[in-house]
Amino acid sequence: MTKVNMKVNIAGVELKNPVMTASGTFGSGREYGEYVDLNQLGAVVVKGVANEPWKGNPSPRIAETYGGMLNSVGLQNPGVDEFIEKDIPFLRQYNTKIIVNIAGRTIEDYCEVVKKLGDADVDLLELNISCPNVKAGGVCFGTDPFMVEEVTKAVKKVAKQPLIVKLTPNVTDIVPIAKAAVAGGADGISLINTLLGMAIDIHKRKPILANVMGGFSGPAIKPVALRMVYQVANAVDVPIIGMGGIMTGEDAVEFILAGASGVAVGTANFINPRATIDVIEGIQGYMEQYSIKDLKEIRGSL
């Protein structure tokens, strides 16, 4: 049997394997402790944290759809101070890397969170630029290349950990957005966030979600995610974390072939709490089947 090396390097941080959780689908790991040995994961990407506690959106926030789900949780979180006090000590019990997803309503919001995390024992930061920019009339940060470069540059200036920028797919062309993030100093790119979607209750003749629209995720979005990862991998020279509809090891291998260094498992966690472990084992099985000793051999090899 081929001895396989699943280690990957994301912006100078070595992970034991490429598999991590997608932000917002795994909390800070406590909820899954009964099912998943966190020591086996390459990294835990925690639910987005903001400078102050966010209440999130009104219910209903979740709607099942064909091939996936819609969510409109609204980044409910207790704030970065509570995260530092309670969640980091919990996660540091495990031999896994910690990636903190950061939310904000203004550039200043993002920077304040990053400053507070400066001396915290975390490994990487993930900047969620799918948030609306309150100072720009609610326009999503991640849909405008100028804003993407501006917010990335500001956050990078105060960040002490490597900075990953998470891209929204709700754009005409993902490549200028990725290039803007790199121009702003991003050490890596993660994509995709959720697609904007909607579901309607035909009996009540009302939207199912209280917020009307929400983020669409699950296996149905994988072809879109793969296409965007492939495009970005061919356009920028920084590590990429690919996500969007990953349910199995085979799905993850597709993302690696498209150019991703890491892969994040999201919606699958709700269906199968052990999804991350299954994906790790699936990648390992694929490598053994094809006598692949190191993931570098196949990354971006299309």
From Swiss-Prot:
InterPro entries: Aldolase_TIM, DHO_dehydrogenase, DHOD_1B, Dihydroorotate_DH_1, Dihydroorotate_DH_1_2, Dihydroorotate_DH_cat, Dihydroorotate_DH_CS, Dihydroorotate_DH_I. FMN binds at residues 23, 47-48, 101, 128, 166, 192, 218, 244-245, 266-267. Catalyzes the conversion of dihydroorotate to orotate with NAD(+) as electron acceptor. Keywords: Cytoplasm, Flavoprotein, FMN, NAD, Oxidoreductase, Pyrimidine biosynthesis. This is Dihydroorotate dehydrogenase B (NAD(+)), catalytic subunit. It is found in: Cytoplasm. One of its GO terms (molecular function) is dihydroorotate dehydrogenase (NAD+) activity. SUPFAM superfamilies: FMN-linked oxidoreductases (SSF51395). The active site is at residue 131. One of its GO terms (biological process) is 'de novo' UMP biosynthetic process. GO terms for cellular component: cytoplasm. Its EC number is 1.3.1.14. It is an enzyme of class 1 (oxidoreductase). The gene is pyrD. Heterotetramer of 2 PyrK and 2 PyrD type B subunits. Pathway: Pyrimidine metabolism; UMP biosynthesis via de novo pathway; orotate from (S)-dihydroorotate (NAD(+) route): step 1/1. Substrate binds at residues 47, 71-75, 128, 193-194. It comes from the Bacteria.
